[in-house]
């Protein structure tokens, strides 16, 4: 027999302990959850969504999706509660207004339009049917034709050195207006000089009086251009100064939007030849037709096609069927429109959760364990799970106090964001080509990250439900009386920061922050552990009952032992008696057979003797 190795039992116990520890770590308390809707259920809702979408035309995929969400919202779950959720980077686009932010524009022909190259932007396009709402005048442009609520773009606008598409009196009746203008842009020099070179030296400066265009002569919206104006007879008086656009009294001045309009059509520029005639400007040549390309960076996009825009109750309804969603344009057909849209950094949406709201899984687990231990029916699995939850509580107590989990998660979000932005914008490969292009790409990334940092900053200030990692379910309950679904719907369709029509995001954010800043119940680790241990040990029997249990168990063991040891003897005795009885029966049977045979022989002998005595 082989000898047992030293430490064999110790190693076996260690393996068993590790196995038990692994099993306990995998144990969880599962609550009954409602199943997700099946594909047939969603398909059954589609006809209702289609009917709802027809109530308020036009019918677009976005409108049908919102109607489907509306129908799903009406399907109430008795055990569910609605909370406001913060959803970053939603997969939707919204119309951009004139009073929100400056739109950066990059071009491929910097010798014609100056500025920064679009080499770091990869042109993309896809078909789309778009429907959106906005309370601001939309950034819509129509090429060589008037269109309701769009700004007409004309061809062949003359500058001292170039001829490009842009804004002139065909946009609307021109007048002059006084105002403050963009304070961060200097005034233009009175002494304008014209020099001919390879590149066009555009100089950004403003005039003291703006050119004001009455858009479509409707006397409702006015386009202001703060660049120095000129006359058709003397275009050089205008100077090589790019337009500076603003609408009405909006404090945002678009300094690069003119390059996007220049890409609607063709252009040409002057170039220097040897001065033979001795004229003022020398011998100047004119290039052939040039077709520049203009691009906007993420998160801005362009929708090109035939747009329908209507104004109802101070709300602009934008509809475009079978249009093109793109980030670059190079030529626009006469009569087509182009609008500028943007992906919002976030949206606020009410969502329903079936479980209770909590921001730390370990604390919620401990609470459920304490509740389960206090119930009449308890089990060993709950006791073991309670020990595991206590260990988890110790490991995450600091996390609950300083929100370390949220900080780490935000770091992963920023890292993933940086990777995705670099990948989508295509800057990783093209960023090293030119210093200027590298700075342009870096500027775009920084601007996008700036918006994301603002979103993350708000995300870091609030606590979120622990079960949802890609959205933030806040503590703020959703109240249909304060925020009807119609306002939520308009918020998703593009109306922001309008208390009367859509969600008042500032008020909603302040209410959420008030909840976060309110005094919170501190976690007393000692009291929590004492309470947990009391509930835990209350499941074990007392000493008196344990003694009775041990006595009864001993008696039961003795009875079992007696039965185990006596039963074989009894069985063996019964078997022996049975075998002895059987032997005796066989012996008696055998003896009876012998007696019967002996008697038969006597009878035969007697018969033989009687037969011999007869004469």
From Swiss-Prot:
The chain crosses the membrane at residues 379-402. Residues 85-378 are extracellular. Keywords: Cleavage on pair of basic residues, Coiled coil, Fusion of virus membrane with host cell membrane, Fusion of virus membrane with host membrane, Glycoprotein, Host-virus interaction, Membrane, Oncogene, Signal, Transmembrane, Transmembrane helix, Viral attachment to host cell, Viral attachment to host entry receptor, Viral envelope protein, Viral penetration into host cytoplasm, Virion, Virus entry into host cell. The lineage of its organism: Viruses, Riboviria, Pararnavirae, Artverviricota, Revtraviricetes. Residues 403-615 are cytoplasmic. Pfam families: GP41. This is Envelope glycoprotein. The keyword Aminoacyl-tRNA synthetase does not apply. Glycans are attached at residues 108, 127, 178, 219, 275, 319. GO terms for biological process: entry receptor-mediated virion attachment to host cell; fusion of virus membrane with host plasma membrane; symbiont entry into host cell; viral process. It comes from Sheep pulmonary adenomatosis virus (Jaagsiekte sheep retrovirus). Interacts with sheep HYAL2 receptor. PANTHER family: ENDOGENOUS RETROVIRUS GROUP K MEMBER 113 ENV POLYPROTEIN-RELATED, ENDOGENOUS RETROVIRUS GROUP K MEMBER 21 ENV POLYPROTEIN-LIKE. One of its GO terms (cellular component) is membrane. Both SU and TM seem to be involved in efficient transformation. The cytoplasmic tail of TM is necessary for the transformation. Residues 590-593 are annotated as: Required for cell transformation. The keyword tRNA-binding does not apply. GO terms for molecular function: enzyme binding; structural molecule activity. Residues 1-84 form the signal peptide. The envelope proteins induce cell transformation leading to ovine pulmonary adenocarcinoma (OPA), a contagious lung cancer of sheep and goat. They bind to the HYAL2 receptor for cell entry. Env proteins probably do not act as oncogenes by themselves, but may rather liberate an oncogenic factor that would normally be negatively regulated. It comes from the Viruses.
